Amino acid sequence: MGSVCLSGGGSLHGSVRVPGDKSISHRALLFGAIATGTTTIEGLLPAEDPLSTAACLRAMGVTVSAIDSSGVVRVEGVGLDGLQEPAQVLDCGNSGTTMRLMLGLLAGRHGRHFVLDGDGSLRRRPMARVAQPLAQMGAEIGGREGGNKAPLAIAGQTLSGGTIRTPVASAQVKSALLLAGLTAKGSTTVIEPALSRDHSERMLRAFGAELISEPHAAEGPTAIVRPGAELHGQHVVVPGDISSAAFWLIAALVVPGTELTIENVGINPTRTGILDVLEQMGAPLEVLNQRDVAGEPVADLRVRYSPLKAFEIGGELIPRLVDEIPILSVAALCAEGTSVMRDAAELRVKETDRLAVMARQLRAMGAELEETTDGMVIPGGQRLTGAQVDSETDHRVAMSLAVAALIASGDTSIDQSEAAAVSYPSFWDELARLQRS
């Protein structure tokens, strides 16, 4: 696709249904693969990251039907210990979730060997945060920089459960340990410094795992999995991804004259930090038609243009909105007062250093802001000017810059706009449709 050129001015109107939740899509594929029987998945995200997970599973003997936007995906499970040693390197593409969850899934496959690799961006991302806790269970994982960087080699072992404190509040780390715990000797207890998204716990229980969650435990949010329970194929309905909905939520609030309804959005409490911040900003947000779909809370969200107040975020809120910080930096530019984001150093080890990239690209559009070691300080009431900017291959940066372009004067050219396809393949088409409505 290359570059996309957007002009400031105009407004957006209509309804939009965002793609399926990326986190839930990955997990539905993985858990279906190690279950017995068939798992059917409605609404699975047909984007690059889940496609990487599906390709890795196929390489290990799992039958996964074609993934596109038109139908239900079927996964024929091979059981808890049925994954085959692959004949080739498992290519995780750009997907950190694929690589980190695969580490947990494969570490306990005794006597089998696996090699995980990815693109240039993924090879730069830290994996020791998963590999080191797995090593406490007896995993043998090697790679560059002492097993911190891909390519990573896994020599499957018989793992032992135990109590593991994770170094960061990360659903990927927690999920990898829970996956490893399914076939370990003895129970595995995972204690986090703060509560991370809980899709794995919800879905593993639905598949039949013996798993207890204690989000308010005295030592910290805790999940305990006991091995031995057979998983059984399920029918999974994937709600819309709130991280993708965030771009439309902010666009509606900052583009004059705009009103949008975002349909079928997952509002799992471990993911709704963005809604808490919008409330802090005084946004006129309506949560409509709340319901429960396959164990996940879902709603429609209606929002319209409105003046906004500055916000401050940090601490335990960050894991609940870590993927939304790039678009929140755009919202901060339009707010009254100075917004402060702290405790978000995790963004420096995403697909890109998102703090540095967003600061660099917004400055190219005339923004004034301070980039700190773990966040940003952004004065509000700023006017942006159209410019040539670059996603730097990051999907969330690409879509955040699109919203910034809508409130800038003049034209903005966004290079490497195709990055949006990692999580939202139809984003540019949807934007054009909402502009025409």
Swiss-Prot record:
It catalyses: 3-phosphoshikimate + phosphoenolpyruvate = 5-O-(1-carboxyvinyl)-3-phosphoshikimate + phosphate. Coiled coil: none annotated. 3-phosphoshikimate binds at residues 22-23, 27, 170, 172, 323, 350. InterPro entries: Enolpyruvate_Tfrase_dom, Enolpyruvate_Tfrase_sf, EPSP_synthase, EPSP_synthase_CS, RNA3'P_cycl/enolpyr_Trfase_a/b. Phosphoenolpyruvate binds at residues 22, 96, 125, 172, 354, 396. GO terms for molecular function: 3-phosphoshikimate 1-carboxyvinyltransferase activity. The keyword Transferase applies. Its EC number is 2.5.1.19. Keywords: Amino-acid biosynthesis, Aromatic amino acid biosynthesis, Cytoplasm, Transferase. CDD domains: EPSP_synthase. GO terms for biological process: amino acid biosynthetic process; aromatic amino acid family biosynthetic process; chorismate biosynthetic process. Belongs to the EPSP synthase family. Catalyzes the transfer of the enolpyruvyl moiety of phosphoenolpyruvate (PEP) to the 5-hydroxyl of shikimate-3-phosphate (S3P) to produce enolpyruvyl shikimate-3-phosphate and inorganic phosphate. This is 3-phosphoshikimate 1-carboxyvinyltransferase. The gene is aroA.
